[in-house]
Amino acid sequence: MSSYFVNSFCGRYPNGPDYQLHNYGDHSSVSEQFRDSASMHSGRYGYGYNGMDLSVGRSGSGHFGSGERARSYAAGASAAPAEPRYSQPATSTHSPPPDPLPCSAVAPSPGGDSHHGGKNSLGNSSGASANAGSTHISSREGVGTASGAEEDAPASSEQASAQSEPSPAPPAQPQIYPWMRKLHISHDNIGGPEGKRARTAYTRYQTLELEKEFHFNRYLTRRRRIEIAHALCLSERQIKIWFQNRRMKWKKDNKLKSMSMAAAGGAFRP
């Protein structure tokens, strides 16, 4: 049964027996054992796959797909880099075989191999772009650090110049000597910081009561002054000052009256 399939495939694909299987080991010791690929793969894989490239000489549809997929697999296999220890010397006289794929790329179907080849190329391109991005980022970081160092240099120079310059001394307060102080300030400090007492505004009732008391007695005793101060809600000092002012006014009035009377008496003298 196996010889039937082998003979049929050998007739259809004349360059099939020249292709060899990837061998993982010392190729010098094992190459003779797997020389004939048709006899090796006929019993293991059946008629579906026998280690040869099914895309060679196939015009129409095959067992595993169309010719375009086979061509893409052949192109991906030739584009993929091959490691030297997995390569085998080709003995075909018709056309050179494609470079064998690494272990991760070997699969039973050509579609899977083309997919892996696309993934490898994408991985290489993404790795290159990542390396370019990292170099770009590192260059930008280098520029940023350089600019930061340039900015720090003027700041440090400004700080050094500020430290070297003497800071302005606070304005000194004027010195006050004892003879400049005000000594004759009232103990009540009613008039404020100047020491001038505000003028007392007496009510009409207080003025009337003080006028009555002055009419009866122009000089008050201490006892009577205390009584009037409690009655009018005033201090003793206010009562004393009011009586002093009232006496001065009374004396002035009396002096003017006496002078007028004297002048009038001399004028009428015969």
UniProtKB/Swiss-Prot annotation:
Decide whether keyword Transcription is in the record: yes
Tell me where it resides: Nucleus
What SUPFAM superfamilies does the record tag this protein with? Homeodomain-like
Keyword set, alphabetical order: Developmental protein, DNA-binding, Homeobox, Nucleus, Transcription, Transcription regulation
> What's a single GO BP term from this record?
anterior/posterior pattern specification
Q: Where is the composition biased (Low complexity)?
A: 75-86, 119-134, 154-166
Mind telling me which GO cellular component terms the entry cites?
A: nucleus
Would the keyword Transcription regulation turn up in this protein's UniProt record?
Answer: yes
Pfam entry (one):
Homeodomain
The protein's matches in InterPro entries, at most eight in alphabetical order, are given as: Antp_homeobox, HD, HD_metazoa, Homeobox_antennapedia, Homeobox_Antennapedia_CS, Homeobox_CS, Homeodomain-like_sf
User: GO terms for molecular function, please?
Assistant: DNA-binding transcription factor activity, RNA polymerase II-specific; RNA polymerase II cis-regulatory region sequence-specific DNA binding
Q: Which residues bind DNA?
A: 195-254
Residues spanned by motif Antp-type hexapeptide: 176-181
**Which stretches does the entry tag as region Disordered?**
75-175
What is said about its interaction partners and assembly?
Forms a DNA-binding heterodimer with transcription factor PBX1.
Which function does this protein serve?
A: Sequence-specific transcription factor which is part of a developmental regulatory system that provides cells with specific positional identities on the anterior-posterior axis. Also binds to its own promoter. Binds specifically to the motif 5'-CYYNATTA[TG]Y-3'.
Q: Which family does it belong to?
A: Belongs to the Antp homeobox family.
Protein name (database record): Homeobox protein Hox-A5
UniProt organism field: Lagothrix lagotricha
